[in-house]
């Protein structure tokens, strides 16, 4: 960890606890800051807040009183999920108090360089692929951000010869000031998180912050097939490395002759890749580009691609019951992810979908329903909207239920020999579950109860 004295004896407000706030508060206290922790959850049933209080921090729970800003606050470190429309953040902005997220704090204290990976879909898969390729290539990677350990904790322990591979959300990237990844990858952009950002444009601009502080000594890995990503990355000062699944890229990564190439050199043949789904070729091209830029040998990249079958909750094979294959794609929290999941199958699909209503309509799914879906069982807040889209698609079997466990039972009842039963919600999980991981685990448990 760098020697950091900027926070000594400064009053710093950590807004929102969860994993990132808890880690940030502990880090700041270790750096000599006077840490004030604020969380909306009452202290009586807030275990993390109680732990921080026991460590001598000033903890205020049960609301976000504006009076906190009267304590000569030098900096606010906010939980990524708390919107900037929160009255406390609005008041802090008016007082010109800097507001950052935990990833910015991690960058400021890290000895190791960062790799940042963002996009609407494929972040987790690409981050894991990158980590595995760097590990195979003996580049001493550590993984942090939305997956793995909280970035602050990893950054504290990281040495200069390591590299931090981070999956970054738009929420995290809105709160960066000096964050400068050595390599920044922008995978794709799809309309998502409208409840937080308001418009696709604002969402895209938040993602593009990943390039904000890059210089000519850095690299920007960009999806050349995504017009929005190309536009949003146009002002990046990093060396641009493009990747494409549809056209040849001389100075980047592409597909030709049934193989993946980087800067004109064949790296791996597609037949050697075990990760299913055409969409995953984009993720592989991005990860391969990062690995090659850091000097990983082709042999190491090929070794990873011959064994990497995917990440949990992303098109995860669960089991086969009476020749019905079950797949868990709980990480599909937006429409594009579900489109890509459906496109991965040639067998008839019984789709389980639904969840938090973020204001999206689901008409974009209609052609995928028509081509791939035999029946749909919906649940959660968005069930009526999904039913409407399924009716437009002319699906013969459409059913809405209240809970995921019931949806699993009904999907199985509608299935036949050779069908795929797929959980790919196209929605966030927070209407009924704490996380998409919890949703996926409950799906898996419900499937095993059918046996």
Curated annotation (Swiss-Prot):
<dbReference type="InterPro" id="IPR013221">
    <property type="entry name" value="Mur_ligase_cen"/>
</dbReference>
<keyword id="KW-0132">Cell division</keyword>
<dbReference type="InterPro" id="IPR036565">
    <property type="entry name" value="Mur-like_cat_sf"/>
</dbReference>
<keyword id="KW-0067">ATP-binding</keyword>
<dbReference type="GO" id="GO:0071555">
    <property type="term" value="P:cell wall organization"/>
</dbReference>
<dbReference type="GO" id="GO:0008360">
    <property type="term" value="P:regulation of cell shape"/>
</dbReference>
<comment type="function">
    <text>Cell wall formation. Catalyzes the addition of glutamate to the nucleotide precursor UDP-N-acetylmuramoyl-L-alanine (UMA).</text>
</comment>
<keyword id="KW-0436">Ligase</keyword>
<dbReference type="InterPro" id="IPR036615">
    <property type="entry name" value="Mur_ligase_C_dom_sf"/>
</dbReference>
<comment type="similarity">
    <text>Belongs to the MurCDEF family.</text>
</comment>
<keyword id="KW-0547">Nucleotide-binding</keyword>
<dbReference type="GO" id="GO:0051301">
    <property type="term" value="P:cell division"/>
</dbReference>
<keyword id="KW-0133">Cell shape</keyword>
<keyword id="KW-0131">Cell cycle</keyword>
<keyword id="KW-0963">Cytoplasm</keyword>
<protein>
    <recommendedName>
        <fullName>UDP-N-acetylmuramoylalanine--D-glutamate ligase</fullName>
        <ecNumber>6.3.2.9</ecNumber>
    </recommendedName>
</protein>
<dbReference type="InterPro" id="IPR005762">
    <property type="entry name" value="MurD"/>
</dbReference>
<dbReference type="Pfam" id="PF21799">
    <property type="entry name" value="MurD-like_N"/>
</dbReference>
<keyword id="KW-0573">Peptidoglycan synthesis</keyword>
<dbReference type="GO" id="GO:0009252">
    <property type="term" value="P:peptidoglycan biosynthetic process"/>
</dbReference>
<dbReference type="InterPro" id="IPR004101">
    <property type="entry name" value="Mur_ligase_C"/>
</dbReference>
<comment type="pathway">
    <text>Cell wall biogenesis; peptidoglycan biosynthesis.</text>
</comment>
<dbReference type="GO" id="GO:0005737">
    <property type="term" value="C:cytoplasm"/>
</dbReference>
<dbReference type="Pfam" id="PF08245">
    <property type="entry name" value="Mur_ligase_M"/>
</dbReference>
<keyword id="KW-0961">Cell wall biogenesis/degradation</keyword>
<dbReference type="GO" id="GO:0008764">
    <property type="term" value="F:UDP-N-acetylmuramoylalanine-D-glutamate ligase activity"/>
</dbReference>
<dbReference type="GO" id="GO:0005524">
    <property type="term" value="F:ATP binding"/>
</dbReference>
<feature type="binding site">
    <location>
        <begin position="119"/>
        <end position="125"/>
    </location>
    <ligand>
        <name>ATP</name>
    </ligand>
</feature>
<dbReference type="Pfam" id="PF02875">
    <property type="entry name" value="Mur_ligase_C"/>
</dbReference>
């Amino acid at each position: 960890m760098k020697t950091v004295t900027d926070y000594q004896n400064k009053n710093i407000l950590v807004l929102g606890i969860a994993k990132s706030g808890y880690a940030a508060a502990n880090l700041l206290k270790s750096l000599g800051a006077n840490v004030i922790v604020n969380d909306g959850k009452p202290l009586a049933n807030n275990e993390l807040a109680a732990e921080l209080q026991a460590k001598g921090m000033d903890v205020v729970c049960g609301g976000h009183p504006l009076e906190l800003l009267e304590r000569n606050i030098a900096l606010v470190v906010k939980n990524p999920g708390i919107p900037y429309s929160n009255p406390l953040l609005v008041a802090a902005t008016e007082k010109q108090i800097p507001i950052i997220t935990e990833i910015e704090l991690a960058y400021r204290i890290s000895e190791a360089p960062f790799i940042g990976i963002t996009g609407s879909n494929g972040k987790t898969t690409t981050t894991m692929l990158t980590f595995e390729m760097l590990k195979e290539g003996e580049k001493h990677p550590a993984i942090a951000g939305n997956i793995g350990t909280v970035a602050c904790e990893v950054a504290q322990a990281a040495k200069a010869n390591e590299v931090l591979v981070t999956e970054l959300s738009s929420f995290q990237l809105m709160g960066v000031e000096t964050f400068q990844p050595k390599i920044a990858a922008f995978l794709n952009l799809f309309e998502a998180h409208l409840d937080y950002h308001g418009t696709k444009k604002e969402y895209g601009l938040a993602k593009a912050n990943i390039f904000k502080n890059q210089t000519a000594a850095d690299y920007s890995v960009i999806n050349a097939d995504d017009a929005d990503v190309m536009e949003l990355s146009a002002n990046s000062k990093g060396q641009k490395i493009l990747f494409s699944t549809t056209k040849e890229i001389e100075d980047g990564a592409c597909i030709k002759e049934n193989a993946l190439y980087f800067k004109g050199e064949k790296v791996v043949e597609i037949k050697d890749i075990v990760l299913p789904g055409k969409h995953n070729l984009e993720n592989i091209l991005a990860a391969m580009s990062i690995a090659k830029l850091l000097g990983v040998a082709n042999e190491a990249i090929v070794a990873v691609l011959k064994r990497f079958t995917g990440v949990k909750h992303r098109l995860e094979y669960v089991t086969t019951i009476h020749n019905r294959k079950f797949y868990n794609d709980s990480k599909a929290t937006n429409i594009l992810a579900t489109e890509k999941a459906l496109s991965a199958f040639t067998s008839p699909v019984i789709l389980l979908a639904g969840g938090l209503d973020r204001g999206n309509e689901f008409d974009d799914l209609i052609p995928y329903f028509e081509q791939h879906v035999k029946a749909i069982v919906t649940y959660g807040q968005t069930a009526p909207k999904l039913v409407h889209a399924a009716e437009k698609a002319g699906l013969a079997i459409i059913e809405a239920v209240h809970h995921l466990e019931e949806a699993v039972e009904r999907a199985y009842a509608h299935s036949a020999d050779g069908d795929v039963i797929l959980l790919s919600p196209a929605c966030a999980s927070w209407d009924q579950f704490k996380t998409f991981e919890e949703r996926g685990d409950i799906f898996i448990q419900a499937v095993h109860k059918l046996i």
